[in-house]
Structure formats: structure tokens, C-alpha cells
Amino acid sequence: MSGNSGASESISIEETNRIRISLGLKPLDISEEKPQKELSDASVKSSYVDQEQQAYENWKKQEQEEINRKKEEELKSKFEKLRQKNERRRRTQGKTLAETLAEEDDQIDANDTRAWILKMRNSSLNKNGNGLNFEAKNDAPRRSTLHSQNAGPNVNSSLEGMKIAHGFQDLNKNDGLVLTLKDADILDEDNHDLLENVEMVQRKTKNERKEDNPYKPYEDENDFLQQSEADQPSEDTFTTIGPQNSLTVNSTIEKHKSDNKKTFGTLVSFVEPTITGSEQSDYRQIKIKKSKKKKSKSDRRKRLVELDAENENENDPSDFVLPNGQSNSDLSVEQDSAIFKEQKKMKIQKRMRELETQSFADDDDLQQSIAMQRRLAQKRAKILKPEDVAEQLQNAEEVTDMTDSDTASGLIFDDTRAFVNSIKETENREALGSINEQAFEDSKDLNDTNSITGSSPTEESNALVEDTSVDISATLEEANTQQENAEDEPLVSDNVGAVLSLLRNKGVIKVSDEAKEKIQKEEEYNKWFARKQQARVELEEQRRKKKEQDRLSGKFEKMTQKEREQYAKKENERWDKKIAEIELEQFHDYKPQVDIKYVDEFGVELGPKEAYKYLLSHQFHGKGSGKAKTEKRLRRIVEKEREERKPIF
């Protein structure tokens, strides 16, 4: 079947080609079976062993090529070394420069250095076309004595054309002159070689310095330039050596030509140039601003406290007291100043609360705050009259009567009623506090007046103080009982905090262990702080009583001013030491609660990662976030604040 099909295919292809040729087309290619046969033969031969053999042969061929390449490089390097060696040998062969010159001129002495130098100079000039015919067949003398009468037919003419930087009168000496080649600038092409005598040049410069008149170079720029030009000689006289060593004195010519003069620097003028109206600039002169010294915050705070105390002392109408205990102002002035007294007391109470709640970092701050508190207590110690105490007690009774009448009329539960009740409660507390403080000041000031006048306290004043203390204690007990009864159960109408405390007490809201521990720590800290303040108050009370005893005993009357100051200093040191000991004992039970919080410049609390990024990394490297990140962060802060401002309900 296969053979018949192949014959039919071959016949069909041949017939097709015959038809295509008759039509004038290109016949089909019949050689398709040959590449298939070759491919089949190659596939048969390409076995695994043949591939390994071919790979080995390729590797051997590559290794041989590498070895041949290395050998070729070694041979090239050897040939290069030999070529360089032969080149060096070729260059070193032959005669040296000294041998060549000696052969050219056998008459020149090898030890004569001057003759050799002149020979070299002549040869270099001959190369440039400007040389002199040096034909020194005789010995070149080291010292030349120049005389015009010695010129003869057999004189050496090697110096013909050279110039001497001296006049004929200077050269006409019997003992002769030693001429040397003058130093010249190698960049100055116009300068020719000159012969000069060193001694004559030095003598000439010395004489010129003596003849020069002193001048002031900073007076004017033009004068300075004229004087500098006068210092430099513009003209010079020289002598030329002619044929057969004949001397020709040349006329004076300019030594420094303006066209050929070369300056290798900048002329600096120390004179301030005058600016005309057209040359004036719009720029202002730079002024150095001195930095002002900034005052520290502590100095400013101290100054503010002192100013407040001075203003209180100046504006207080009760500062001036007569010996009989009456004020120098009448009753109307006292009534007008009642508001001012209340404002002043509120300020003092606020300042005392700030001092009490202040945390002391070290002993220095503690001593400063105690001294400030002592000064404020001394400044606000004023005399309080019995009439004022009675008036304040009467006002307190009227307030209590008003509250009783309001409560008896009935109960009205609304926002206005709650607001008014809260105001009255605060007024009652402030009134009670002011009564207690005034009674304390009254007793203290009465003792002060008695000690100043030298009289003992009267029975009437003692009775008045006892009555006021009894009334104050009674009112305080009543206020405490009312406050305890009111604080037994929080009112729902007060605020959200009262509602939360009520729900917490009833057990509706459960408190977590962490919150309980935090609340317990806060309570322990508050108790510790209260004990600390109570101990300090008791110590101050003992100190005050001790001072009163010393004042009443008459101890200070026998002392001088200096002894009083020393005694007061010792007492202050003793009490300060005692306060420090009490503080140290109290700190044994102190357990600080440390809570580290990171806050950025916008007041936003940060986590540890953000704090490291913004507060440490950016500040250390001195760079911040980009514009896009900063705007995104600000938008997030604004959105967070907007969410917090939304109402709860």
C-alpha cells in the first residue's frame, strides 16, 4: 500500500511539473527526501558517546589555543624588553657633551669655568641667530680691566656688543673692576644682558635712599602713584663694548617703555575713592545688628510676683492704721473698698494653691518656694477689725436664711435652679474660707500691734477672738454635715460624671482591674500629698507660735539689730532643716507613678513608633517629612478634632 501510494504521489508531482512547465511556471522541488535522509543519519550518529567525544575535543582545542596565546604574549614582552634595552644602549653610545666641546676647542682649559660658560652661551645664541662669534684662542682672563688706551690689534673681542650698566667715569679706575652679569627677568624679552659691578650698584642704591625725602603714601592716590614712579629710575646710562674692546658711552634712553611695560600684579590703593553724584549706588551700607540679651523666664516670673505684691501694698486702703486701732479712712471708703479686698484675697488664695500644688524638684526649689510663701504671708498680714468680722458673719447668716427659705417653698427641678444652687454652694464655701482666714489674720495682727506698742493683749480682744472662733467652728461643723449629707449620693442632674459615678456605685458599670489599680494608686498619691501638706502646715503653725512667744517675752528688746538678724538667720536654718527632715521621712512611703507620654508640636499624643520617627529621628537628622505627608498628617489631626467635638447624643 505504501509503495503504491508513493508511486502515485511521484507521478502526480511529475505530471504537475509537466503541466506547470507547459504553462510557463516554475516546477516544484522534488529534493525534499534528501534532507530528511541526512537528518535521519545525523540523528542516528549523534549518540551520547559521540557528544562526549566532541565535547572533549572542543575542550582540548580551547586549552591549546589558550596555551598558544600565553606563549605569544611572553614572546612579545621579551622582544619589547630587548628593544628597549638596545634603544638605551644606542643612546648612551658616542661622545658626551663635554667631550664634544673639548674636541671642538682644545685650547679651552677644562678647569676654567668662566670660559666654559661663555662657550655654552655663545653656542646657544648661535642656534637662535643672535650669537656672537666666540673665538677665544687665548686664555680667557677671570678679571678684565677695562681701559680705553689698552685697545690694540691683538685684543680679545669675545665681549664685543655687550653693555655695561655704568658710565665711563666709573669704569676709569686704575685698580680695575670685577663685572658680573646682571640678574634680569626671564619673561622680559627687551632686556639685554648687562654687566655690572656689585659694589657700585649697592653704593648707588644707598645714596638714592639717603636722597629720598620721606612721604605719606596714604594722603592721596595720585601723590602715591607719583611718588612710586619717582622711586623707580626711568632712565639709565650704559656703556657698550665695541670692536677691539673699545668703549662707547651711549646717550640716556628710557629704561621702562610704556608700550612694553608688563605688570604681573594689581596695584592696591589704600585711599578711599570719592564717589560722585552719578556713581552713587542705591544699595545701603550694611549695618551689624547687635543681638539683645533675652531675660530668662524665672526672672520674669519673679518680677511679676514682686510687681503684684507692690501693687497690692500701694492700692490697699487698709495699710495705714492709727495707734488706737482705727483706720484713717471713713466708713464710706471702707464700704467702697470691700470689693477690692475680696478680689485681693481671691488672688492670694489662687497663688497659695499654685504654690501648694507645685512639685519640688530639688532642695533649692523647695527653699525658694518656702521663702516666697513666707514673704507673701508677711505682706498680706493686715489688721481686721471686729466690725468687719461681725458683718461677714451676718452676711453668712443671711445667705443660709435665703437658702432655707428657698428650700421650704418647694422643689423646682430645672436647669436654672441647678445653676443657681451650684453658685450659692461655691459662695458659701468661699465665705466660710474667708471667715476662717480673717479670724486667723485678726488674732495674728492683734498680737503684732500689741508687740509693736509694747502693751499686753487686752481681755476684750481675747474675748472677741474666742467668740469668733466659736462661731466659726459652729458654722464649719454645719457646713461639713451638710456637705457630707449632700455627697452621699451624686445627683443625676449635675453632669455626665455624676451619672457615671452613680452607675458605678450601683454596679451597672463594671470597672476593670487595670482601672481599679490606677484609681487606687491615685488615691494613695492624694493621701500621701495631703499628709505632706498637713505636716508642713503644722510645722508652720509651730514656727509661728514660737515667733509669737519670742516677741512677747521681750527677748528682742535686749538685742541689737545685728544680733536680731543673726538670731533670725539661725532660726530659719533650724526650721528649714526640720522641714527637710520631715520631707525625707515622708518620701520613704512615696511610690511614684510614671506614665511616659509623647506629644508633638500640635498637642497630639503619639505612640512609641511615631515618637521615634518625629521626635528623635527627624530632629537628629535635621529633616522632616515631605509636603504631601505633612498635609496628610494635618488633615488627619483636623478630622480627629472634628470627631471629638461632635456631641455624644
UniProtKB/Swiss-Prot annotation:
Composition bias type Acidic residues, residue spans: 307-317
Example of a GO biological process term: maturation of 5S rRNA
Biased composition (Basic residues): 286-303
Stretches with biased composition (Basic and acidic residues): 29-40
Database matches in Pfam families: HIND, SART-1
Entries under InterPro entries matching the protein: HIND (IPR045347), SNU66/SART1 (IPR005011)
CC terms in the record's Gene Ontology section: nucleus; spliceosomal complex; U4/U6 x U5 tri-snRNP complex
Localization (cell): Nucleus
Key word Nucleus present: yes
Compositionally skewed regions (Polar residues) per UniProt: 43-56, 448-461
Ranges in a coiled coil: 49-93, 516-583
Residues spanning the signal sequence: none
Major subcellular location class: nucleus
Region Disordered, residue ranges: 27-61, 78-98, 129-154, 286-327, 433-464, 541-570
Function statement: Required for efficient splicing of pre-mRNA.
Protein family per UniProt: Belongs to the SNU66/SART1 family.
Subunit: Interacts with hub1.
Name this polypeptide is given: U4/U6.U5 tri-snRNP-associated protein snu66
